[in-house]
Amino acid sequence: MEAAAVTVTRSATRRRRRQLQGLAAPEARTQEEQEDQEPRPRRRRPGRSIRDGEEETVFREVVSFSPDPLPVRYYDKDTTKPISFYLSSLEELLAWKPRLEDGFNVALEPLACRQPPLSSQRPRTLLCHDMMGGYLDDRFIQGSVVQTPYAFYHWQCIDVFVYFSHHTVTIPPVGWTNTAHRHGVCVLGTFITEWNEGGRLCEAFLAGDERSYQAVADRLVQITQFFRFDGWLINIENSLSLAAVGNMPPFLRYLTTQLHRQVPGGLVLWYDSVVQSGQLKWQDELNQHNRVFFDSCDGFFTNYNWREEHLERMLGQAGERRADVYVGVDVFARGNVVGGRFDTDKSLFTARDSDNRMRGVPEDNGTARPQPVRAQLLPPCPCSSADRFSRALFWRACGTMGVMPSSPQSLELIRKHGFSVALFAPGWVYECLEKKDFFQNQDKFWGRLERYLPTHSICSLPFVTSFCLGMGARRVCYGQEEAVGPWYHLSAQEIQPLFGEHRLGGDGRGWVRTHCCLEDAWHGGSSLLVRGVIPPEVGNVAVRLFSLQAPVPPKIYLSMVYKLEGPTDVTVALELTTGDAGSCHIGGISVLNAETSSRHSLRPLRVPPTKLARWVGRCGRQLSGGWVQHCYEVSLRGCLLLDLLVCFSRPPGSREEESFTCRLGEIQVVDAASLLAPLPQVQAVTISHIRWQPSASEREGPPALLQLSCTLHWSFLLSQVRCFRIHCWGGMSDDSPGRELPRPEMPMFLGLAFATQYRIVDLLVEAAGPGQDRRMEFLVEPVPKEGFRVPQAEWGRAVLLYSAPA
């Protein structure tokens, strides 16, 4: 496959060559090379020419309808959209080497700093995502058009995310890695062998000498490091010969050691399947028959048919490593299991106080402890079975029932004994229940578990979220509608808050509930809806949205975008809590009061600080669509930022019950000094892999419209960017058939990129007439970590001039 012509400096070419060499030898890569992903086409396609200007590179192209096939592993064969992929055999694994196309699938987001760290001995929560074979809508790296996609957003309850499928090497789709990392959750792929074919595969790399299994381990580590996820679940679902099972512990030890060297915080987990004799014999516990595998890696994932006596026996086997034992809970409740479905919480137990979750705080009457959500219970799903059977068959059976099973049993027992938990296939609420009720069922399911799931805190700034789920019925950019129609883009999901419903006051008349909502958005496709009733005896209610443990710089800038819906006189304010109260000093005009040594209400700025006016010029103004932005500037010294809360207060003189509905569109907490630092510019934008097709409506005769597909590449320091917004002048995206051509002064938004490359697919453009040149300009807008917009003059750009064949 030939690539478009490019112009890059010699230094950039040398840097790319060093990077590819580093991928072949991971231990030689520097941190700078790890952060600077800039794939480049290397050869000139015949018939193309370029010229350089001071501000843009111009590419010339003669339209041709000749096929230019792309490798099907990396691109969808029907649309040429980039896709995430898996490896199906040992041969594919050993033959894998990084290619330029792999750059689409490399995670942009590093694993966010969190407290407590994953290495702590607090019991953890693992989510094993197994849905209908995997690689569904989530495989489209740049997003897709989906009416009712699956979404997971209770990230603060989760410590480890495993992407599971029945392919030999399951590489997590990059959207899951980006989203999980943003929330401080580590991501594992799956290495699985099954049936007779799996037995032959294991014999091929385990029955020989150490070089064979070390080659497999080295390749798994290289894949982990290149795609920037965090490790592997090893699942051997077939019997092993004595020679092969004898080499399994050394293989696990070597894999774990090498992964720890190359991927800080990396994890290797073993699934309870094979025993040390080589038999495939699920134990449902850690015991003397499988302990050797646990001792050779980072953790043990038990099978699901355990009873409390299994947990009691494991206490002695696990010793001080109880948190490294992940007790499996099948949410589908297949087999002879404890809990499952809406009974899943019965397998967990802990004495931990629900005050570590989201709480309501009525200021007049102290702290109101939240009450668990009490869901309506219905009969068990009739498609359940005590047999071990195919997930696909189960899904087909249960997916047609539409019956909601019964209430919470199994997590209770796991927490009682101090073990970690592995929730298998919680997508049950999506697969087996009505799609139209998905969000209600998702919140119900996780709401019943929340008191058993310790949360973790994000501990770094900047902290910015628009509450976007990475999906929506339309796409909005800072209050301005960009496109109408359903969309789904996993990498675009932003940091999600603590969710729940809680009762306030002694008689329970007051309540507050938070949930995500696709009906309106400030930025992205969704917002956070907070509804509640302030009872007469309560003055105001503070809703804790985020748990943080972030050291803060001397001065921070905060912003909140919100709108109140319906007639109400309730007021809204942003609050924060700080730690290290003995040495923490807070100052600045925005601090209104400090009722305790650590909780602070903030007074909005009337005008933005002069130095920050370029970024925060909307402060205190009514925005489009009824949104309001409040800005704050706070001076701090020796402080730790612990919580972000939103406070709802009754109007002065009110003695009645006050109800409110508030939509939160964005919250920002950034180092004020970082807003003054210059942002690097997007450089070396190139165009390659161009494909032309006649418009679908004009397959016969000379077309007036063409469909253009091409790939953009550019250079940028990834550590300073959240994502890139891709635009063009002149053209109409085929994904939005009802959208008019943009006004000349407005470039058209095409999509989001979370890498330094982007595939444009089926963009409608005017055909060039005889002797004519048509012009398309592509623009790459960097979105800085702080979340503000960059002036258009600082975007990267490249021009495509195309003409009809002579």
Regions found by a protein language model. Name each.
Residues 2, 10-13, 118-310:
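Chitinase-like catalytic core of GlcNAc-active glycosidases
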Residues 60-87, 97, 330-363, 388, ...:
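Substrate-binding cleft of secreted/luminal carbohydrate-active enzymes
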Residues 161, 528, 542-574, 628-636, ...:
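Extra-cytoplasmic beta-strand recognition segments
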Residues 500, 510-544, 586-620:
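Short carbohydrate-recognition loop motifs
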Residues 560, 608-673:
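Extracellular beta-strand ligand-recognition surfaces/modules
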Residues 705-720:
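Conserved aromatic anchor
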Residues 761-791:
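Beta-strand-rich modules
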Residues 785-805:
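Extracellular fibronectin type III
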